Amino acid sequence: SDQGSSAGVLSGNAQDAGDWAALPNAYLSWALNKDLYVGVGMGAPFGLVTEYNRDWIGSAHSIKFDIKTININPSIAWRVNEKVSLGFGLNWQRMEAEYVRRAGIVDLPAGAGGVLIPRPLSQSFATLDADDDSWGWNVGALFTVSDATKLGVSYRSKIKHELEGSLSVTGPNPVFNTVGSSGANATVELPDTFIFSVAHQLDPKWELLGDISWTGWSSVDKVDIMRSSGALAQTLDTDFQDTWRVALGANYQLNDAWKLKFGVAFDETPVKNPEKRLT
């Protein structure tokens, strides 16, 4: 608890920090001829939203984390022959981040005899708002092994975001609000991914699907939040590890108008242990 702060005791259950979110996805493609196709896709490959009450016990670590990405992916695909097709794409990606926590600022009220006594200002809050646009690429190949079986491989590159924005402090002390606020920046390298997939047409009704993917989350080792002066404001020690994901599924052609899809997946977490978990 925070007995000596101007806000009194910090306590309480964090409650449910998650909520519903909309994930935009759209895809279009055009055939230039029988062997050459172009297309464009839009999606949100990475995102996070957690928000707690401002008086919860972990508010000095995090009150709100809101990370959004939008990815636009123009691509081209070429059918080399009846057995092999190749694809290549560019990725324009926008990232927006908001991070709010209780500020680690110390007030210095005069105690007995005029002595300055440090005291946390738990009524003060620090907010980081930052964004960036960046580019990446992806490649893929599709192999027709037989009339019933197809294999696919794809790779999507890392995308390095150099986020720029502001770090603002709000609270009861206008001096600390002014001194604590500044421009800010942070660098985040979102991970690359490799996917191997297989599809097998079991019969006219059933199609079996499977894939295994690897994501290089170790690229997000830590995130340094820097002030525009060059001073370090905070380090987020993410220390993520690379992960694997395995998925199995099936499509069932109910009739000419309807296809039913089923699937299950096991996805590893990039967080090494509970002590490394970000709120």
PLM regions: where:
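Outer-membrane beta-barrel porins/channels
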Residues: Q3-N13, W20-T279
